[in-house]
UniProtKB/Swiss-Prot annotation:
It comes from Proteus mirabilis (strain HI4320). [4Fe-4S] cluster binds at residues 149, 152. The gene is nfuA. Belongs to the NfuA family. Binds 1 [4Fe-4S] cluster per subunit. The cluster is presumably bound at the interface of two monomers. Pfam families: Fe-S_biosyn, NifU. This is Fe/S biogenesis protein NfuA. Keywords: 4Fe-4S, Iron, Iron-sulfur, Metal-binding. NCBIfam families: PRK11190.1, YhgI_GntY. The keyword Transmembrane helix does not apply. Homodimer. GO terms for molecular function: 4 iron, 4 sulfur cluster binding; iron ion binding. SUPFAM superfamilies: Fe-S cluster assembly (FSCA) domain-like, HesB-like domain. Its cofactor is [4Fe-4S] cluster.
Length: 192
């Protein structure tokens, strides 16, 4: 479910040494399954453990996860990285905003998952987003762009060299390509 690297475990162990005995950590998601999902880590003293919590034991500590957050923390990783600028704790939870779908789920659900978990986080850095409108019978994903992507002069590159390439790589037997449904109108909202 959650991976905590050795460096992160060592960091948490130092912090926990200054807390009351048997205090562990809690990993959680606020607003799970929504575009506003946020992940966090907090101290979890013994009296804060709930009956429906899942305990994940690591070498140097335990992490508690509530049952609502658990499916959204699938494949999450906590690391403690050090570079020239200093050190920081990182928490990557690719499924926090959308629950991971099964490999045998319908194609439309699997494509939607990739768009929400991998593509939209990249587009968000430019204030953009993409939505899956439908998948045609002949295997084309029909997409609609919004935000900073609408009217952006780089949309063809994003569509063909970015999104289409990624989706065809992931679904080679099921998709033939992607098409843009958006009526692009350049404005102040456009990224380029």
């Amino acid at each position: 479910m959650i991976t905590i690297t050795d460096a992160a475990q060592a960091h948490f162990a130092k912090l926990l040494a200054n807390q009351e005995p048997n205090t562990q950590i809690r990993v959680f998601v606020i607003n799970p399954g929504t575009p506003n999902a946020e992940c966090g880590v907090s101290y979890c003293p013994p009296d804060a453990v709930e009956p429906n919590d899942t305990e994940i034991k690591f070498e140097k500590l335990s992490a508690y996860v509530d049952d609502i957050s658990a499916p959204f923390l699938e494949d999450a990783e906590i690391d403690f990285v050090t570079d020239q600028l200093g050190s920081q704790l990182t928490l990557k939870a690719p499924n926090a905003k959308m629950r991971k779908v099964a490999d045998d789920a319908p194609l439309i659900e699997r494509v939607e998952y990739v768009l929400q978990s991998q593509i939209n986080p990249q587009l968000a850095s430019h204030g953009g987003r993409v939505s899956l409108m439908e998948i045609t019978e002949d295997g084309y994903a029909i997409l609609q762009f919004g935000g900073g992507c609408n009217g952006c002069s780089m949309i063809d590159v994003t569509l063909k060299d970015g999104i289409e390439k990624e989706l065809l790589n992931l679904f080679p037997e099921e998709l033939k390509g992607v098409k843009d449904l958006t009526e692009h109108q350049r404005g102040d909202h456009s990224y380029y």
